[in-house]
UniProtKB/Swiss-Prot annotation:
The gene is murE. GO terms for cellular component: cytoplasm. Pfam families: Mur_ligase, Mur_ligase_C, Mur_ligase_M. Gene3D superfamilies: Mur ligase, C-terminal domain (3.90.190.20), Mur-like, catalytic domain (3.40.1190.10), MurE/MurF, N-terminal domain (3.40.1390.10). It comes from Corynebacterium efficiens (strain DSM 44549 / YS-314 / AJ 12310 / JCM 11189 / NBRC 100395). The keyword Metal-binding does not apply. UDP-N-acetyl-alpha-D-muramoyl-L-alanyl-D-glutamate binds at L48, S50, T178, T179, S205, R213. The lineage of its organism: Bacteria, Bacillati, Actinomycetota, Actinomycetes, Mycobacteriales. This is UDP-N-acetylmuramoyl-L-alanyl-D-glutamate--2,6-diaminopimelate ligase.
Length: 526
């Protein structure tokens, strides 16, 4: 175990809410108070809107929005019980116009201080937790699940925050974002601490790093999975995307974790390790690294076993129910992060053995004679990795249903179609979450790439366009025969399809099961 192993905090079980005075909060964030004759006013909660303001003594954080300034909603938050307002000078002008005379705390940029302010209101809870953050383009959710289960097997009480939701010691807690806004996040840390949680595993998105959602959080370990094209609607270039992730690792960054582990299987990982300076490295492709995976064996079911060479421990055996070389990388990274957090690697590895992640290489089995999988892959590199993995598990043909999300990075649409057609025998282009865009426009971009990939592929490829996602799934399953493999890619664990501002219930897993049963019943009747 490393000499600089983080401490394991003593669980706190008090139910008394934390509090900070308005004057203390102003001094902490460097703000200026107005209309505040009583600087000893106690603040117990902080929120960005009325729905997140708790009943006891909250302060409303009014930030500029894409359409309106948050201060325009001051009447709503006042009705919710907000005793004071944290805002900028534009917000103060709006409050004056509305005749709002509550105490106000003025700063130049609310988002810049919101993380520290929220942490202060809830008593800096992350410092009483061993906090492990996972970032990267793909693999965050799977790595986080592996960490959660491994830590639980090692005897710790664990919190999880990520794409598929939040859990406190295994119990679900509703959240909306991969990385919640700073007030919600700090309150979650506070709740976890109250419930005796010792370790928290958290997915950290590039948006969260860029927008300051994790400011004020003390991370013991940061883990980097990989980087590939995504979010170029938010980050203008891959370099900007990389720089956002690097905030978590770069020496001198206020967001940098105490310890870092970086997978160097791709060039971006190698660069990230260089940026971090003192990061420990992970490799599964034969590169020299601190943690290396080897002796990989794969069963017909996709179950994998391998060893990880761990500094000061030697080789640790690992078994995974999850298929794919990328999951060997995810598991090795999870193990490395756990070791950096002072966890016994052997006990941790036992916990990873039976991890299943909703919508990630999730097999759907209704007794059919071909392999059917649902996966969240919605980025070019992820789609390619999933198809490459499935190709190794089947003797027959490979088919995929693929689409792309609206109001998101449009430059990845054609590459997703192209990479699919280079690997699959059948590509069905369909709708994902069109959001406010015209679905046919999105499909056209994916189709362009698919046709190009089919023309350049070293095998015959059929490309179809079926806009209705349920119909596309049925067509894929009707096409599949004995020994084939199919994957419905893009939505994974999601249970809704967002079209023109309306979310319709839609679960790829349900649709695949229904189509499989329907196809089998038709076959039995023949």
């Amino acid at each position: 175990m490393c000499a600089d192993t983080p401490h394991h905090p003593t669980p706190v079980h008090t139910e008394e809410a934390m509090a900070i005075t308005l004057g203390e909060l102003a001094r902490t964030i460097g703000g200026e108070l107005f209309n505040a004759p009583d600087q000893d006013l106690e603040i117990h909660n902080i929120g960005l809107d009325s729905s997140t303001l708790a009943k006891k003594a909250p302060i409303f954080a009014a930030v500029p929005g894409s359409r309106k300034h948050g201060a325009e909603f001051a009447d709503t938050d006042r009705a919710a019980g907000a005793l004071a307002v944290l805002t900028d000078r534009d917000g103060a002008t709006i409050l004056d116009r509305k005749g709002d005379t509550r105490p106000r705390l003025i700063v130049d940029d609310v988002r810049e201080v919101l993380g520290v302010a929220s942490s202060s209101v809830y008593g800096d809870p992350s410092r009483d937790l061993v906090l492990i953050g996972v970032t990267g383009t793909s693999g965050k959710t799977t790595t986080s699940y592996l960490l959660e289960r491994g830590l639980m097997e090692a005897g710790y009480k664990v919190g999880l925050i990520g794409t598929t939701g939040t859990r406190i010691d295994g119990e679900p807690v509703p959240t909306k974002l991969t990385t919640p806004e700073a007030p919600t996040l700090q309150k979650l840390f506070y709740r976890m601490r109250q419930h005796g949680v010792t370790h928290v595993v958290m997915e950290v998105s590039s948006h969260a790093l860029s927008l300051g959602r994790v400011s004020g959080s003390h991370f013991n370990v940061a883990a980097f999975t990989n980087l590939s094209q995504d979010h170029l609607d938010f980050h203008d270039t891959m370099e900007e995307y990389f720089d956002a992730k690097a905030l978590f690792f770069r020496a001198g960054s206020p967001l940098a974790a105490d310890h870092q582990v970086v997978c160097i299987d791709d060039e971006w990982g190698t660069r990230m390790a260089e940026v971090a300076g003192n990061a420990q490295t992970v490799a599964t492709t034969g590169k020299r690294a601190d943690f290396t995976a080897g002796l990989v064996t794969v069963k017909e079911t996709g179950e994998q076993s391998f060893t990880v060479t761990v500094p000061d421990h030697g080789e640790v055996p690992v078994t995974l129910a999850l298929p794919g070389a990328f999951n060997v990388a995810n598991a090795t990274l999870a193990l490395a992060a756990a070791v950096r957090a002072g966890v016994d690697p052997v006990a941790f590895a036992r916990g990873m053995a039976q991890v299943a992640v909703p919508g990630r290489m999730e097999r759907i089995d209704e007794g059919q004679d071909f392999l059917a999988v649902v996966d969240y892959a919605h980025k070019p590199a992820a789609v390619a990795a999933v198809l490459d993995t499935l190709r190794t598990q089947i003797d027959g043909r490979l088919g995929v249903v693929i689409g792309a999300g609206g109001d998101r990075d449009a430059t990845k649409r054609a590459p997703m179609g192209e990479l699919s057609a280079r690997r699959a025998d059948l590509v069905i282009v369909t709708d994902d979450n069109p959001r406010s865009e015209v679905p046919a426009t999105i499909r056209a971009a994916v189709m362009e790439g698919a046709r190009r990939g089919a023309a350049e592929a070293d095998h015959e490829v059929e490309v179809r366009e079926i806009g209705d996602r349920a119909e596309a799934i049925r067509a894929l399953i009707e096409w599949a025969g004995p020994g084939d493999g199919i994957v419905v890619a893009g939505k994974g664990h999601e249970v809704g399809q967002l079209i023109a501002g309306v979310t319709h219930h839609f679960d790829d897993r349900e649709q695949v099961r229904e189509a499989l049963r329907h196809t089998q019943s038709d076959g039995e009747g023949k």
